[in-house]
């Protein structure tokens, strides 16, 4: 069970009447007046915290997200209710400051409320949760396209949250993923439901290594990691807001309101001057959203994390086709036969063969091409043979692609073609929202993904 899912919040209504509290507490009325003067209900950050649409109503349908009975439809009423709630004593973990820490922090800062004016609160559930994450910086992860899933045909983005000084251990950092929640077996209608918003999109939190294994091992997708130019304070505020969203879902659309679109909203929240989501009202292609962030100086140079299959292919290229062929055969041979085969090779070549054989068999195993009863003991025995060779690993890191994904051509395309076929002249006007075809430059895209 994920860390986020293991947290249980009781969204009970506050055991007081907010209107009555405002009448008996002059501070509340004073801060209402300040909020009115500053027009906080129109502030871009409040609008984004409330997921306000063009009609000034919230997109959120979960009633527990609002303290005012009419908060969804009247964001000004919700603002007043939230200000009042700050001054109401509650049981542990029930304060607005525990349930909505980002919202509360913003209100306290905007109104200049002093800590000694507020009742003491204990938010052990939230503090334990964020204490495990220790957010200090955020990195946007781009997983290249995966043709085996309609929701991932254009790639996928998620967010990794790194503690301070954990550059070498970021696999154990937590990752925030926004994805469609699919219940049951919907194979026949999956694409249609995803295109028409019939699945709920929800945030989830899990260790980053799980996503690396899923994308890099199981689905053979290279990862590109773009650290965001966010301060530690902005990163913590973003994560505090994710806590607020754990019971909230939105209709998930594969092409428009998808993973990339919602992650843009998180960046917009902590960067009020950015208006990233507004640029993607119709189609949110993950790589195009990263380009938009890059244009605003929000990303740093990416780190390339090749998939396991990419690594194996690179080894085969580096070590030569003949050794790669032996490794492929060795992966499926009984170990006693393997020992005889290896004798005709130098220790260096033996190490290369065994390393490739291990990776080859592991890829077949996770791809369900071989049975576990064979694969597990065979993998252990291949490792044992390799450990007997006193040489450092022979694997070399795959060569980084010369063109990064953000340097590839834009996804959207309008074309005008003139030509002649068997004496018949033609004019063709075309429009494409995403992907590329055979006449587009290959740089930044995986080989073999052209539309025909």
Tell me what each language-model feature is.
Residues 6-17:
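Bacterial N-terminal signal peptides
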Residues 22-118, 226, 241-423:
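Activation targets extended, charge/polar-rich intrinsically disordered C-terminal tails
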Residues 134-218, 431:
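Glycine-rich catalytic cores of cysteine/serine-nucleophile enzymes that process amide/ester linkages
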Residues 188-260, 270:
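N-terminal accessory/precursor segments of enzymes
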Residues 404-410, 438-451:
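Short loop/turn motifs that connect adjacent beta-strands in outer-membrane beta-barrel proteins
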Residues 416, 429-435:
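Residues on the lipid-exposed face of transmembrane beta-strands in outer-membrane beta-barrel proteins
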Residues 421, 436-438:
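Sequence/structural signature of outer-membrane beta-barrel proteins
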């Amino acid at each position: 069970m994920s860390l986020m899912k293991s947290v249980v919040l009781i969204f009970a209504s506050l055991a007081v009447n907010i209107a009555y509290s405002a009448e008996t507490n002059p501070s509340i009325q004073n801060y209402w007046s300040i909020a009115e003067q500053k027009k906080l209900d129109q502030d871009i950050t409040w609008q984004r915290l409330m997921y306000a649409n063009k009609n000034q109503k919230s997109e959120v349908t979960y009633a527990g997200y609002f303290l005012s009975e009419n908060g969804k439809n009247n964001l000004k009423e919700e603002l007043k209710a939230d200000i009042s709630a700050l001054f109401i004593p509650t049981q542990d973990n029930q304060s607005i400051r525990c349930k909505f820490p980002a919202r509360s922090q913003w209100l306290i800062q905007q109104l200049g409320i002093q800590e000694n004016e507020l009742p003491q609160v204990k938010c052990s559930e939230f503090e334990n949760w964020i204490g495990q994450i220790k957010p200090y910086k955020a990195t946007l992860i781009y997983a290249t396209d995966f043709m085996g899933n309609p929701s991932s045909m254009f790639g996928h983005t998620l967010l990794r949250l790194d503690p301070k000084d954990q550059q070498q251990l970021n696999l154990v950092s937590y990752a925030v993923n926004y994805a469609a929640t699919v219940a049951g077996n919907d194979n026949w209608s999956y694409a249609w439901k995803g295109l028409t918003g019939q699945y709920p999109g929800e945030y989830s939190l899990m260790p980053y290594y799980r996503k690396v294994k899923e994308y890099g091992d199981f689905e053979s997708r290279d990862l590109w990691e773009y650290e965001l130019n966010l301060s530690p304070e902005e990163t913590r505020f973003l994560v505090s807001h994710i806590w607020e969203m754990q019971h909230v879902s939105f209709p998930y659309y594969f092409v428009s309101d998808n993973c990339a679109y919602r992650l843009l909203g998180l960046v917009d929240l902590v960067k009020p001057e950015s208006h990233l989501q507004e640029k993607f009202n119709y189609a949110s292609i993950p790589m195009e959203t990263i380009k938009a962030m890059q244009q605003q100086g929000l990303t740093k140079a990416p780190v390339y994390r090749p998939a396991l299959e990419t690594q194996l292919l690179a080894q085969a290229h580096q070590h030569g086709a003949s050794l790669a062929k032996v490794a492929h055969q060795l992966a499926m041979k009984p170990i006693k036969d393997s020992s005889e085969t290896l004798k005709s090779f130098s220790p260096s070549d033996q190490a290369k063969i065994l390393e490739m054989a291990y990776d080859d068999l592991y890829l077949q195993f996770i791809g369900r091409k071989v049975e576990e009863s064979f694969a597990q003991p065979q993998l252990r025995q291949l490792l044992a043979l390799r450990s007997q060779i006193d040489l450092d690993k022979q694997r070399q890191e795959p060569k980084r692609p010369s063109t990064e994904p953000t340097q590839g051509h834009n996804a959207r395309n309008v074309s005008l073609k003139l030509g002649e076929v068997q004496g018949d002249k033609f004019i063709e006007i075309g429009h494409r929202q995403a992907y590329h075809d055979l006449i587009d430059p290959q740089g930044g895209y995986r080989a073999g993904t052209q539309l025909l």
